[in-house]
Amino acid sequence: MSEAYKNAGVDIEAGYEAVKRMKTHVERTKRAGVMGALGGFGGMFDLSELPYKKPVLVSGTDGVGTKLKLAFLMDKHDTIGVDAVAMCVNDVLAQGAEPLFFLDYLAVGKADPVKIESIVKGVADGCEQSGSALVGGETAEMPGLYTEEEYDIAGFSVGVVEKDEIVTGNSIKEGHLLIGLSSSGIHSNGYSLVRKVLLEDAGLDLHQTYEPFKRPLGEELLEPTKIYVKPVLKQVKAGKVDGMAHVTGGGFIENLPRMLPEGLGVEIDNGSWPVPPIFSFIQEKGQLKAEEMFNVFNMGIGFVLAVKEDDLVDVIRELEQDGEKAFLIGRVQKGEGVTFGGGSLS
């Protein structure tokens, strides 16, 4: 042990203890293709063990943003890792790829082995939900950059798809229909606005329970991001999906056009799905316009599929059989951007 380093704020022994605690969680994410063990300089994966003829790797990286601030305030760290995984694997999924492996980066103000284990448990939970192996990562103790209670987490996902099965959105045409999959809540974006509206302006207490919720506000806000990989991949592999969008920062307005060919837009049937109460709660407390809400939040739809009309009924039925709540929320039309029909946004 380096006493000088410890006195400078870096506890090597605590770091070793954290790694030891991680191992059982990492172990349960192993899958076909994983090589080596935790602790090597690099994670290894053998693609030849998988039945892909012309594999294309698809990668994604992301973080959790200021949702972390709520985890600090609630001293609740066991689900924030799920968010880190979800933000990455849902992006990879949007290209039709099966997530293979994941790496995490955790920067902490102070190495607390119990807290780090709790965070990594969440990462492993997310990896299990998505079929990803947690093959490595980095935990950096950074005194002076973060307070002892603070940390940041980011992730990196790699997936694979057959070259001729990549979902690019290029085959989407006017008349394609949009299936929206329900979100679990706010997911992992818009939290700077959430904190300003609910905590700074309204002065609400994260530990209190407010109507219409049945648990403390902080727990409601920390509900982890839903991972859509397994049910959606079944539809992708069946050839029934022509485009996908992960509804994250920028909401419907920014994310739906990302899957569309040039010259096409979408019309969303406002009111065609139930909006979770957390969004109306935020809108009311902040006196926010509906346009603002749709420009920031997922509004209850976390992932969108573009399908042909002939496939609509089968895809919705099969998604619901797999436990998803799926809704016909709109259609592709000529033009640009996102328009709303079926109900006012005011």
From Swiss-Prot:
Domain of life per record: Bacteria
Major site of localization recorded for this protein: cytoplasm
Catalysed reactions, as listed in the record: 2-formamido-N(1)-(5-O-phospho-beta-D-ribosyl)acetamidine + ATP = 5-amino-1-(5-phospho-beta-D-ribosyl)imidazole + ADP + phosphate + H(+)
GO biological process, one term: adenine biosynthetic process
Key words of the record: ATP-binding, Cytoplasm, Ligase, Nucleotide-binding, Purine biosynthesis
Entry EC no(s): 6.3.3.1
One term under GO cellular component: cytosol
InterPro entries registered for this protein in UniProt: PurM-like_C_dom, PurM-like_C_sf, PurM-like_N, PurM-like_N_sf, PurM_cligase
CDD domains: PurM
Compartment(s) of residence: Cytoplasm
Pathway participation: Purine metabolism; IMP biosynthesis via de novo pathway; 5-amino-1-(5-phospho-D-ribosyl)imidazole from N(2)-formyl-N(1)-(5-phospho-D-ribosyl)glycinamide: step 2/2
Gene Ontology molecular-function annotations: ATP binding; phosphoribosylamine-glycine ligase activity; phosphoribosylformylglycinamidine cyclo-ligase activity
HAMAP family noted in UniProt: AIRS
Family per similarity comment: Belongs to the AIR synthase family.
The protein's name in its UniProt record: Phosphoribosylformylglycinamidine cyclo-ligase
The organism of origin for this protein: Bacillus pumilus (strain SAFR-032)
Origin organism lineage: Bacteria, Bacillati, Bacillota, Bacilli, Bacillales
